[in-house]
Swiss-Prot record:
Binding-site positions, (6S)-NADPHX: G169, N222, V223, N224, E225, Y226, K227, R228, D291
Keyword NAD attached: yes
Upper classification of the organism: Eukaryota, Viridiplantae, Streptophyta, Embryophyta, Tracheophyta
InterPro entries the record matches: CARKD, Ribokinase-like
The organism's place on the tree of life at top rank: Eukaryota
Chain sites annotated for binding ATP: 262-266, 281-290
NCBIfam families: yjeF_cterm
GO cellular component: chloroplast; cytosol; mitochondrion
Source organism of this protein record: Arabidopsis thaliana (Mouse-ear cress)
The protein's name: ATP-dependent (S)-NAD(P)H-hydrate dehydratase
EC code: 4.2.1.93
CDD domains in the record: YXKO-related (cd01171)
Any one Pfam family match given in the protein's UniProt record, by short name: Carb_kinase
Amino acid sequence: MLVKPSIISGLVRLTSHSPSSSSSVLRRQEFLVRTLCGSPIIRAMSSTSEADAESVLRTVTPSLDLKRHKGQAGKIAVIGGCREYTGAPYFAAISALKIGADLSHVFCTKDAAPVIKSYSPELIVHPVLEESYSISQLSEEDKREVQDKVLGEVGKWMERFDCLVIGPGLGRDPFLLECVSIIMLLAKKSNVPFVIDGDGLFLVTNSIDLVHSYPLAVLTPNVNEYKRLVQKVLNCEVDEQNAEDQLRSLAKQIGGVTILRKGKSDLISNGETVKSVSIYGSPRRCGGQGDILSGGVAVFLSWAQQLKSDPESPSENPAILGCIAASGLLRKAASLAFTKHKRSTLTSDIIECLGESLEDICPAS
């Protein structure tokens, strides 16, 4: 259907000057504009695929209602955390809470658990994962028993979760990675979405079948992780001149998973469409921001999933919406934190700005 530019302009004016409209009507108007502006005809009129991150945030963020009960705003679980790395799983899990999830779990190794528990009493920490050194003296049969126990501990919680974050602080221990690969299969069997980051991407890059053709999988690679994915899957080098087309090809080759390529502009694709998010941002590149992003994607993806039961909800892929929303919010929070702290900005400063940033875009009252 040909959509006249005058119609688009009218809709934009309507959404910009309707303060008395109900929030539900306004959200439908905003989504209609986004949908039309993303149509093939309108895309041909524009050279950009920039997503309206703030509008997506307002669309997917649920309103606060006294009738809601604990858990309805999201139950997130982070699979990660070992002897060497305890900060990353904490950043991902606490970010999920700061954005608005009701419950946030961390499944980590026994060595990491006391440390992560000490960071915050808000997190539910499960010290159930095992590393090779702790079972090195066991027979193969006993090792399998340990693995079965680990999988049983995680599996009994699986269907309670709205989304998993797999990889922050995971490390590359062979036994641990083997257990996590089976956890991913359990999640797929239960249709639980998951976000893969950090060392989870190392695992997936070497075992693409773990995520292939699973539409509820999201990969969030940084520049080096993306390079390894491209080399492994497409058997070529990263092509910055055709970045969008290459990202689309990569996501399509992995069976339509959603990939959020982090960078100066975040690029997002599920093999069909490509969206970019470049608003806000910060020149401070302290470690841990990717963990905030993965926790945020998990929350917004779960919220977008909840919208699917609403006949007036957006029809776009929940994973795409989750990535756009999380990217936009992180960029705004990072910008705000940098304004306050400049060169001394840390990941913890950005986390403290998440609530303020979301409130500015999508007021709770």
